[in-house]
Amino acid sequence: MSPSDVPINWKRNLTVTWLGCFLTGAAFSLVMPFLPLYVEQLGVTGHSALNMWSGLVFSITFLFSAIASPFWGGLADRKGRKIMLLRSALGMAIVMLLMGMAQNIWQFLILRALLGLLGGFIPNANALIATQVPRHKSGWALGTLSTGGVSGALLGPLAGGLLADHYGLRPVFFITASVLFICFLLTFFFIHENFLPVSKKEMLHVREVVASLKNPRLVLSLFVTTLIIQVATGSIAPILTLYVRELAGNVSNIAFISGMIASVPGVAALLSAPRLGKLGDRIGPEKILIVALIISVLLLIPMSFVQTPWQLALLRFLLGAADGALLPAVQTLLVYNSTNQIAGRIFSYNQSFRDIGNVTGPLMGAAISASYGFRAVFCVTAGVVLFNAIYSWNSLRRRRLAIE
């Protein structure tokens, strides 16, 4: 029996990759609460300079990730997804360790860029599971896997803030590096993949990848959908705390209220993603995607008219429940419309679009709020998501007509 014929325990792989995504999500978000404080500790002074450098060290990771993702995706299709998971976890662990030793802002900026270059654990985990799980369970499996990163991202800032208060800023980077090394060990010992390496000559070029797709136009529309989902999420991030303060008035626990309102969509997505993924397996992920986008529009508009923080919290919880269906539905449709041979590259291209959205979303939100106020951000974001819903519906309708 050849290695590729050995049966894979995909359920165990799903469990271990979920843990890996949880640890990676936690590791990335552990340092987020105090990133501007660390920038200040590295010698940056003055309000405008601190804002500029904080924005740079935050966004440069996503920019370099967007650039590097297609390369790593191609390598994953040649060498296998497990080795890419190991490369990512170990590489990020080393970079996090070095971040704790940075002596000036330029060193830190370069290391943040390197973190983006070496990242990619979660998209490779998605590609691994997508190629192993039975197709009729893709929605449930990818929805479940998405909750790993969400859970880690929710707990990370809380843990990072507590650790920074007790031990200082630099030790948190060392703790984060340890968490990522644990992720490396879990992947090394417990994830199994039957993969026959492909020579560079046998690899499909970009044109051949596009030609091998069942519906290239639909796949491109799914990439655009991923970008817009991240733009919509990120556009609200820069103004959320300030908007909550405007709604709450002069209260002493504004940080707690803002933190809670920031986290409730993640909690809702955690609860909804596996269930909506399973529903998508039954009725079709395209229906879940369109309905979730329309619900998102209907929830974003009233956010610009709320009068209290609790009204905003309720709407954001409902929005999170809808958002929990979006990326897993996109990923499931990508699985349906591509082959295992090119899964690594398809998921890495999708990650690049996601990273671009992570950069442009906050910039859009900040620009709109500066010109038209906080409430306008929600209306414009609703308009962007509505465009996405119409665009996605049209792309999916064309696919259905082509099949008929």
From Swiss-Prot:
Membrane topology according to the record: Multi-pass membrane protein
A GO-annotated cellular component: plasma membrane
Principal location class: membrane
Record-linked SUPFAM superfamilies: MFS general substrate transporter (SSF103473)
Keyword Lyase carried by entry: no
PROSITE patterns per UniProt: MFS (PS50850)
Transmembrane regions listed in the UniProt entry: 19-39, 56-76, 90-110, 113-133, 144-164, 171-191, 222-242, 254-274, 288-308, 317-337, 376-396
CDD domains for the chain: MFS_MdtG_MDR_like
Keywords carried by this UniProt record: Cell inner membrane, Cell membrane, Membrane, Transmembrane, Transmembrane helix, Transport
Subcellular location: Cell inner membrane
GO-annotated molecular function: transmembrane transporter activity
Superkingdom of origin: Bacteria
Keyword Disulfide bond in annotation: no
Pfam families the UniProt entry points to: MFS_1, Sugar_tr
Family to which the UniProt record says this protein belongs: Belongs to the major facilitator superfamily. DHA1 family. MdtG (TC 2.A.1.2.20) subfamily.
Record protein name field: Multidrug resistance protein MdtG
Organism whose genome encodes this protein: Salmonella enteritidis PT4 (strain P125109)
Gene that encodes the chain: mdtG
